[in-house]
């Protein structure tokens, strides 16, 4: 729910909650989204337009054209591209991302609920997967803390776009019950 914590997660895979640290390998699309949206604003001593084009082709799932575009890039830009696309941050990508974070501070303040969520008076229901690698669960915990009227459910059964049933029968049953309670509150709220 704020740019600093998300950038830290995308660059390290480490998240913190209640004084504990967790390591969840970040989904590669986190870096892709950052560079897709902000690389064009970054002043570099090299032209980033061809790298931007390669990233855009990857997003469009045009793998043939993307491969052709990547082959045209200078070696250091190929390394940057592969680091971004793989989600494994090289020192250069880390440096670029940190520069983006500094340069885009105003934009990130406008996007970060940390600065405006307190103004939302309606009840907000947040459901998040504990092992979501796109956006870590700690962001939902922070968001729930910023909102004045919220119901939060973090479930071990949910991952990004997937359901995980790796916990054993009783654990899964307990998690399903927690999800049912959350949904009951949600439906009850909107029935009234």
Regions found by a protein language model. Give the residues of each.
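Catalytic histidine neighborhood in serine/cysteine hydrolases
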Residues: 147-165
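Conserved alpha/beta-hydrolase "acid-adjacent" motif
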Residues: 108-109, 133-139
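Flexible internal linker/loop segments at domain or repeat junctions
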Residues: 68-104
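Active-site nucleophile elbow and catalytic-triad environment of alpha/beta-hydrolase enzymes
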Residues: 99-116
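Alpha/beta-hydrolase-fold enzymes
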Residues: 1-78
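Short beta-strand/loop motif that positions the catalytic acidic residue
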Residues: 119-120, 126-128, 132
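Short alpha-helix in the alpha/beta-hydrolase fold that links the catalytic acid
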Residues: 122, 136-145
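Catalytic active-site module of serine/aspartate enzymes centered on a nucleophile-bearing elbow/loop
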Residues: 163-192
């Amino acid at each position: 729910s704020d740019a600093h914590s998300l950038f830290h997660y995308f660059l390290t895979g480490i998240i913190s909650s209640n004084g504990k640290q967790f390591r969840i390998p970040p989904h590669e699309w986190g870096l892709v989204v950052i560079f897709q949206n902000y690389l064009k604003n970054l002043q570099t001593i090299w032209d980033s337009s061809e790298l931007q084009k390669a990233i855009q082709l990857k997003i469009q799932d045009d793998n043939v054209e993307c491969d052709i575009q990547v082959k045209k890039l200078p070696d250091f830009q190929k390394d940057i591209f592969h680091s971004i696309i793989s989600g494994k941050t090289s020192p250069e990508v880390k440096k670029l991302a940190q520069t983006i974070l500094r340069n885009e501070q105003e934009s990130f303040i406008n996007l970060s609920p940390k600065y405006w969520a307190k103004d939302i008076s309606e009840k907000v229901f947040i459901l998040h997967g504990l092992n979501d690698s796109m956006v870590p669960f700690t962001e939902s915990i922070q968001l729930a803390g910023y909102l004045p009227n919220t119901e939060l459910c973090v479930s071990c059964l949910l991952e990004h776009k997937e359901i995980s049933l790796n916990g054993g029968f009783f654990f899964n049953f307990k998690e399903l019950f927690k999800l049912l309670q959350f949904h009951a509150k949600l439906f009850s709220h909107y029935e009234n």
